[in-house]
Amino acid sequence: MRILTENPLLRKKCKLVTIDQGRLIARRMVAYLLANNKKNRNKKDLGLAANQFGIDASVTIVLIKQKPLILINPKIEKFSEIKFMHKEGCLSFPDELIDVYRHLWIEVKADNHKENLFFGSRVDQNNSGDILESAVVQHEIAHLNGLTFYDFQWNTSPTPDQW
């Protein structure tokens, strides 16, 4: 498999899948990303959405911590009003780095997790989470909704109902 670049699947909202289907897809994605990171030691890829991998399925993986995070049919349930800007790259747009805005924190519901997952930092609650992980999860969930990082540039950020 290879990462899709100029493919209409990247601009399409992905189909919901069963947890078993999602796990099978995620295994292939994790294997690909780990092998790719091992081969390209200078550049670490942090996440991958199924549609980038050529599969119309609402599945994403994030490789920031020791164990890969798998999200099947993820949906952002809550998010901070506060946003931060940082540079992002994307496997589907190699060698591109752009400034994007992301929410400081998000709460995500996924079919393969019993409880909502929290990513980011709630300054008002002294919760110093990982804002990089929050940004990567937002980036990958956006892919599953047919959005790319170009849609999150400071002057083109989508409204919450587009998530």
Named regions from a protein language model:
Residues 1-163:
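Positively charged
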